Amino acid sequence: MDCYLRRLKQELMSMKEVGDGLQDQMNCMMGALQELKLLQVQTALEQLEISGGGPAPGSPESPWTQLEPPQWEGSRGPVRPGACSPSNQASLGSTSSGKFPSHRSVCGRELATPPRTPLPEPQPSAQQGPELAEPDDWTSTLMSRGRNRQPLVLGDNVFADLVGNWLDLPELEKGGEKGETGEAGEPKGGRGQPRELGRRFALTANIFRKFLRSVRPDRDRLLKEKPGWVTPTASEPRAGRSQKVKKRSHSKGSGHCPFPGASEPRRGENASTGCPKALESSPSGFDINTAVWV
């Protein structure tokens, strides 16, 4: 009986030693996992710093100082005994609480962190200045810089307006010739080629402008000659139009103008003279040729 009791006591002591070893191994493994998580956070922060070109919004030291490996004292798991030696456990206990070296041994294995190059953080922030305030929001800044002008109204033909304004500009052939004759005494060193290019560009622009003016009638000239022109058919003879209006008015037997927007003629006037006057007195603000000529 005494021999059996001694064997039981020895087995209990060995079980206690094995339990202590398992607890140390569990603490070792949990510390290694916590260090791996912290290394992942550190690499993610470094990638953000490299991609953003400046310091990340959260300081990289905050997760290192706040997060500490928990002491799993009361937990025991199925870990193989003898996996960690006491020297490795002591080295882990000394290194898992503070800063992390580049190489450390965990349970007989070496965790090697990738070599990191030091990033010059304060230099780009001092050079770029306010541009680093929102490194990820560069699209909004680009849109705000490009959209300072007023928005365009739907249906507005901007290209037609630009070309129309360019056609309305006076020609600069005479001014260019005068400038060339006045500056003929200067040496033709480096200014000869740009001047020749400018003259050729002006000639081609004037030719293109004349062609477009032949397609689209000159608005100012037509307004001076015929102040009441509205439609492209304004060049028709007035006599034929008045005869048509006379026939329509006689066939209907009433003195009103066939156009619904025209006012009724007075008693002393005929229907034939009322309708052309209404056409001539219509406002010339909207010009269908200048609006839809492209």
From Swiss-Prot:
Its main location: nucleus. InterPro entries: FAM212, Inka. Pfam families: FAM212. Residues 134-177 are annotated as: Inka box. The keyword Signal does not apply. Residues 171-198 have a biased composition (Basic and acidic residues). The keyword Acetylation does not apply. Transmembrane segments: none annotated. Residues 85-99 have a biased composition (Polar residues). It is found in: Nucleus. It comes from the Eukaryota. Keywords: Nucleus. One of its GO terms (molecular function) is protein serine/threonine kinase inhibitor activity. Residues 241-253 have a biased composition (Basic residues). One of its GO terms (cellular component) is nucleoplasm. The Inka box (also named iBox or inca box) binds and inhibits PAK4 by binding a substrate-like manner. Inhibitor of the serine/threonine-protein kinase PAK4. Acts by binding PAK4 in a substrate-like manner, inhibiting the protein kinase activity. Interacts with PAK4. This is PAK4-inhibitor INKA2. It comes from Bos taurus (Bovine).
